[in-house]
Amino acid sequence: MLTIDNLEDLAISLGVTLCTHVGGKKGLWNAPRRAISIRRGLHPVAHLCTLAHEVGHATLGHDSAAVGWWRAKQELAANRWAARRLITIEEYAAAERIHPSLSGVAHELGVTVFMVEAWQEMYRSGTYARFLMDA
């Protein structure tokens, strides 16, 4: 599993500037400036998952000005990128054996419930295997 430090190092290696902001969205990707901003004061788990999502946008070359269906497609891709890198199939299986609830699985994995849901959707849809080949 990636850590905040790993993700920050990856972002920097991609030429992305990291900064913070107060209030508003948890995270922002600004493609023209090649910058990621994370809201100050986030819980460490939310910080990790938000940063992973935004680094996904950067890695995938997303257009931060996209709207409509194109933006939705980019959001889904960034969610999947983050989930694939934060949760392995082995870690997920172990967490699910220990905890019957979605929130318990998320807690065990050290990620948000939203990230577990993104991982589950990717696994159910069969896209998880494609991400394994692309990793």
What are these regions (language model features)?
Residues 1-135:
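Active-site hotspot residues in diverse enzymes, especially metal/ion-binding acidic/histidine motifs
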